[in-house]
């Protein structure tokens, strides 16, 4: 049983869309796979809130309405509950800055991942925000991925500035000593010029294969995205024989 970690160059770059595409593609190969989002936020956009004055209103860290988690549930063929594939959902963003952030227990995340690894062939673990985003005051998602020695898939939202973000993230993944299985290009800005040139340059600079290109789509979370993923051999390093 194996798990791998999917991260992105930023927030809103299409991590969950890429997760759906990978899950669907591997299921088409007969692999039993589920997604796991250990920490989810009901909003990842930059919204000003006065945390000191809104602790009570924003303290619902066990809600079950995160769209990313719900998309992961709908993407797998397995019958999973919200609680099974999510350890914490916050109604506010970045709980590290709030009292509620203290409720995140790494031990619970470890146990939830171990439970999924024991039950399913493969577990796609989707991070939140970017690679070095803190989980608490002393620990970030990159640290947690390293503690489990999970190989990494990087989602690059193709936009202005993505070259710098992508290369810095790749460098940090390498510094953590984790293998980069590959990267996925997600076209989040249909009007961006030089798209092909950006893909070519990233392919030249990143020492890992391009696993797929997801075009700009309307409601991609409702579509069959498997056809956009290739180089599946990079994602099937795990055992692919189901237990009897």
From Swiss-Prot:
<feature type="binding site">
    <location>
        <begin position="186"/>
        <end position="187"/>
    </location>
    <ligand>
        <name>ATP</name>
    </ligand>
</feature>
<keyword id="KW-0963">Cytoplasm</keyword>
<comment type="subunit">
    <text>Homodimer.</text>
</comment>
<keyword id="KW-0460">Magnesium</keyword>
<keyword id="KW-0067">ATP-binding</keyword>
<feature type="binding site">
    <location>
        <begin position="12"/>
        <end position="17"/>
    </location>
    <ligand>
        <name>ATP</name>
    </ligand>
</feature>
<dbReference type="GO" id="GO:0005524">
    <property type="term" value="F:ATP binding"/>
</dbReference>
<feature type="binding site">
    <location>
        <position position="222"/>
    </location>
    <ligand>
        <name>ATP</name>
    </ligand>
</feature>
<feature type="binding site">
    <location>
        <begin position="215"/>
        <end position="217"/>
    </location>
    <ligand>
        <name>ATP</name>
    </ligand>
</feature>
<dbReference type="Pfam" id="PF13500">
    <property type="entry name" value="AAA_26"/>
</dbReference>
<dbReference type="GO" id="GO:0009102">
    <property type="term" value="P:biotin biosynthetic process"/>
</dbReference>
<protein>
    <recommendedName>
        <fullName>ATP-dependent dethiobiotin synthetase BioD 1</fullName>
        <ecNumber>6.3.3.3</ecNumber>
    </recommendedName>
</protein>
<keyword id="KW-0093">Biotin biosynthesis</keyword>
<dbReference type="InterPro" id="IPR004472">
    <property type="entry name" value="DTB_synth_BioD"/>
</dbReference>
<keyword id="KW-0479">Metal-binding</keyword>
<keyword id="KW-0436">Ligase</keyword>
<dbReference type="InterPro" id="IPR027417">
    <property type="entry name" value="P-loop_NTPase"/>
</dbReference>
<feature type="binding site">
    <location>
        <position position="68"/>
    </location>
    <ligand>
        <name>Mg(2+)</name>
    </ligand>
</feature>
<comment type="pathway">
    <text>Cofactor biosynthesis; biotin biosynthesis; biotin from 7,8-diaminononanoate: step 1/2.</text>
</comment>
<dbReference type="GO" id="GO:0005829">
    <property type="term" value="C:cytosol"/>
</dbReference>
<feature type="active site">
    <location>
        <position position="37"/>
    </location>
</feature>
<feature type="binding site">
    <location>
        <position position="68"/>
    </location>
    <ligand>
        <name>ATP</name>
    </ligand>
</feature>
<feature type="binding site">
    <location>
        <position position="126"/>
    </location>
    <ligand>
        <name>Mg(2+)</name>
    </ligand>
</feature>
<dbReference type="GO" id="GO:0000287">
    <property type="term" value="F:magnesium ion binding"/>
</dbReference>
<dbReference type="GO" id="GO:0004141">
    <property type="term" value="F:dethiobiotin synthase activity"/>
</dbReference>
<feature type="binding site">
    <location>
        <position position="16"/>
    </location>
    <ligand>
        <name>Mg(2+)</name>
    </ligand>
</feature>
<keyword id="KW-0547">Nucleotide-binding</keyword>
<comment type="function">
    <text>Catalyzes a mechanistically unusual reaction, the ATP-dependent insertion of CO2 between the N7 and N8 nitrogen atoms of 7,8-diaminopelargonic acid (DAPA, also called 7,8-diammoniononanoate) to form a ureido ring.</text>
</comment>
<comment type="similarity">
    <text>Belongs to the dethiobiotin synthetase family.</text>
</comment>
């Amino acid at each position: 049983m194996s798990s791998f970690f999917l991260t992105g160059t930023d927030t809103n770059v299409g991590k969950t869309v890429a997760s759906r595409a990978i899950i669907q593609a591997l299921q088409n190969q007969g692999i039993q796979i589920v997604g796991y989002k250990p920490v989810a936020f009901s909003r990842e956009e930059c919204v000003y809130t006065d945390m000191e004055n809104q602790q009570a209103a924003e303290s619902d860290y066990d809600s079950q309405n995160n769209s990313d988690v719900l998309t992961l549930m709908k993407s797998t063929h397995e019958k999973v509950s919200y609680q099974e594939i999510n350890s914490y959902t916050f109604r506010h963003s970045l709980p590290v800055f709030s009292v509620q952030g203290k409720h995140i227990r790494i031990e619970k995340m470890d146990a939830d991942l171990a439970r999924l690894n024991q039950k399913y062939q493969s577990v796609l673990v989707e991070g939140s925000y970017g690679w070095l985003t803190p989980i608490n005051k002393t620990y970030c998602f990159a640290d947690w991925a390293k503690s489990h020695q999970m190989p990494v898939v990087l989602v690059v939202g193709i936009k202005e500035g993505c070259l710098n973000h992508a290369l810095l993230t790749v460098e940090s993944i390498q510094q953590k000593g984790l293998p980069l299985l590959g990267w996925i290009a997600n076209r989040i800005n249909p009007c961006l010029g030089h798209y092909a040139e950006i893909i070519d340059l990233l392919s030249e600079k990143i020492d890992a294969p391009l696993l797929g290109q997801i075009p700009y789509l309307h409601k991609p979370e409702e579509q069959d995205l498997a056809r956009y993923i290739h180089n599946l051999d990079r994602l099937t390093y795990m055992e692919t024989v189901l237990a009897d």
